[in-house]
Amino acid sequence: MKKNATIVYTIKRSFVKSDISILEALDYNVFQIQSPPKKTVLAFVINRIKEKIKSIYYVSRSKILIIWFNDYHAFIPILFSKLFLKKSVIVVGGYDAIVDEQNQHGLFFNTGLRSILAKINYSLVSEIWVVHKSLEKGCSYAKEKFNIISGV
């Protein structure tokens, strides 16, 4: 019998497609929750409603929840993974692990709803995977040379 996995992402980039292919090769049935970035309040709310409905259905049936990047789209699926006692993973790519004051860049540059949710997400997931080791503990070169704080 096939195992189920749920993958959450904003845009279906090549690395997301690769992960889906890898999971399918490992005999997983892959449920997908795509939550594209939207600028209007209505579209934002509709995305959250879709995430809730899909999370209830998909996460409850999955062995694992995998989320590409930490942002709004991660919060609701993570809550349902906790509710259904499922393993959850966030894959951190950079923006969601840095503060670059000079360029005013990074999820934690501003202290608003996004950064608050991101901190909550990091505290709730089972595991945090980084795409590069410098995102785990932070990059000392980036800190010294450019005053960029990184790391989860």
Annotated model-derived regions:
Residues 115-152:
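A short, active-site helix/loop in glycosyltransferases that binds the activated sugar's phosphate group
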Residues 31-54, 67, 104-109:
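A short, charged, and often flexible helix/loop element on the N-terminal side
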Residues 55-74, 86-90, 127:
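Short N-terminal targeting/anchoring amphipathic segment
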Residues 81-100, 129, 147-149:
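Active-site proximal beta-strand in glycosyltransferases
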